Amino acid sequence: MEARYVDLDKLRNIGIMAHIDAGKTTTTERILYYTGRKHFIGDVDEGNTTTDWMPQEKERGITIQSAATTCFWKGYRINIIDTPGHVDFTAEVERALRVLDGAIAVFDATAGVEPQSETVWRQADKYNVPRIAFMNKMDKVGADFYMAVETLVTKLRANPIPVQMPIGSEKDFQGVIDLIKMKAIYWVSEDGSVYEERDIPEELREEAEMRREEMLEKIAELDEEILEKYLEGEEISEEEIKRVLRKATIENKAVPVLCGAAKANKGIQPLLDAVIDYLPSPLDLPPVKGWRVSDGEVVYRKPDENEPFTALVFKVQVDPYIGKLVYFRVYSGRLEKGSYVYNSTKGQRERISRIVFMHADKREEVDYVRPGDIAAGVGLKVSQTGDTLCDEKEPIILEKIDFPEPVISLAVEPVTKADEEKLVKALLALSEEDPTLQVRVDKETGETIISGMGELHLEIVVDRLKREFGVNVRVGQPQVAYRETIKKSAEAEGKYIRQTGGRGQYGHVILRIEPIPEEEGKNFEFIDKTVGGVIPKEFMPAIEAGIKEAMMAGPLAGYPVVRVRAIVLDGSYHEVDSSEMAFKIAASMAFKEAMKKAQPVLLEPIMKLEITTPEEYMGNIISDLNSRRAKVESLETRGHLKVIVAKVPLSETFGYATVLRSLSQGRASYIMQFSHYQEVPEKIAEKIIKVV
């Protein structure tokens, strides 16, 4: 058997999630470094020692270009899915979490839980992803392991169980004590690849025993049997501790906590052991749920090669050498290269010409994939992020990945004629990779408009256009993606009748529209309440299409209409003259008429802004926020810094980076993410409508 195909219980699909500066990349690099060395040292006799790809003497960062990397540790295969730490890219995190089975959450031991870590943690909660925590940077000034662990309780309401205790901290950080084995672990070689277990130093013995006691107490709370043994004062074995911890981690009832300093090459190997000990294999999780294409019935697919093939596309990348790479996670069945696969989301079959596994340093072509595998396919032309790939004989649709709607737009235009064609190709490639980037051409002005999740998101897109695709573009002022909605219900009638020689046109619709409350999370709902066949059922899709078309431009300022329920109450038809087109036009007329009566209002995107600043600038920053229609929601102290959390309209935030820099002499930083849409105050709405 090839080393690649391990049994399912020996497979781990994990992500590494973290706040931007917690040291996620370094932790990932070290994992690839040690697993690479370990794997290849072990396999010399198989003749695959082609591995001097990481020059030991040079500390060079492997930034994982790939969305998924595979590595081996002690006979287990670990697939690592890359998740970015910046909030403008929450969509990337969402899609990675969908296909993960577990995660390592990396924290900076000097800060514990930081604002972005909360966002990512909540997303992981949404998908019930089991986690272990790694307190990194134990060698940094201000590192405090137990303070950092406490923030998991206060900020994330998690149940952390430290299974290690640090030996020293800051510049005296030397290693860790394993509280399960009660051994001290020291790293001996400079590159951290050699480490040894020793007895716990005498001066730390007492504290270690106290910390072990705390750990056992928490573990006893998770399991009746262990509780009895614990209360009786009986010895609890290493196997029992790990069994209970594993079960609790997989059920999201506990988070084992480890510590180390990735940059100083300490703590990584025990972290890999913890991935194997506590995080789930595909067999530990419930089967994936989907909907049968033929009748919408719920079906489940088990991680079994004999089940029909089912996979989810979670990322598309354009590789300069092999073209479009479609990354997917296999949930059930088996797929051979060169065979056909059915994309049930698009309703098309495609041929997968090659299948590759990504290693940190190379691509490995494989003949087939099985359940639990994370691979990239070549030759899939229509497949996009969120699509389901399956067996054409048993089509199924997995839950789609929900991406937030873009909130900000920019006009981009090519500088020269030569750039024009390149721009179209480049934007097509980028929007395939990133589902939160939308591209459209403005009908009236002919401008190309790109829309995304924030200023930074679009800056990066423009930067990539220049750097990767060599397209020079001019960029317009950022524009806010306003929306329109209604505040009350209204009814209206639409009649479209044309009598000109030959066949006429006849469509007649009576509609009611009503507001959908924001908490329902729906932008549109269509209900047919007609009775007695006043309008034949076959015209209903045309009526819905007419309404949707009318919703593209609202009555106030031509912005898209959201949060509206349209109910068809009545109408009439003509045996000969009625057609789909006539009903589409009549429905559109009725909707536009009803909108005018339903008290239409403008909505604007509100952003959540988190600013971290030295205390002396706080007053100026807050008074500036007040001038931007912001609502300050909380102020907290983190070390010697203040954290301000506020909600502020997107339209008031353009260029905020520069403003904040000058207010704080470059010492404050901020992160911003979309929060919700809210009604624009009347005075401001009037100005916006005037401009349009």
Curated annotation (Swiss-Prot):
Gene Ontology annotations of biological process type: ribosome disassembly
GO molecular function terms noted in the UniProt entry: GTP binding; GTPase activity; translation elongation factor activity
SUPFAM superfamilies reported in the protein's UniProt record: EF-G C-terminal domain-like, P-loop containing nucleoside triphosphate hydrolases, Ribosomal protein S5 domain 2-like, Translation proteins
Binding site for GTP: 18-25, 82-86, 136-139
InterPro entries registered for this protein in UniProt: EF-G-like_DII, EFG_II, EFG_III, EFG_III/V, EFG_IV, EFG_V, EFG_V-like, G_TR_CS
Pfam family, one: EFG_III
Subcellular location per the Swiss-Prot or TrEMBL entry: Cytoplasm
Entry annotated with the keyword Protein biosynthesis: yes
Primary localization class, coarse: cytoplasm
Domain tr-type G stretches: 9-283
Function: Catalyzes the GTP-dependent ribosomal translocation step during translation elongation. During this step, the ribosome changes from the pre-translocational (PRE) to the post-translocational (POST) state as the newly formed A-site-bound peptidyl-tRNA and P-site-bound deacylated tRNA move to the P and E sites, respectively. Catalyzes the coordinated movement of the two tRNA molecules, the mRNA and conformational changes in the ribosome.
Family: Belongs to the TRAFAC class translation factor GTPase superfamily. Classic translation factor GTPase family. EF-G/EF-2 subfamily.
HAMAP family xref list: EF_G_EF_2_B
Protein name: Elongation factor G
Organism: Thermotoga maritima (strain ATCC 43589 / DSM 3109 / JCM 10099 / NBRC 100826 / MSB8)
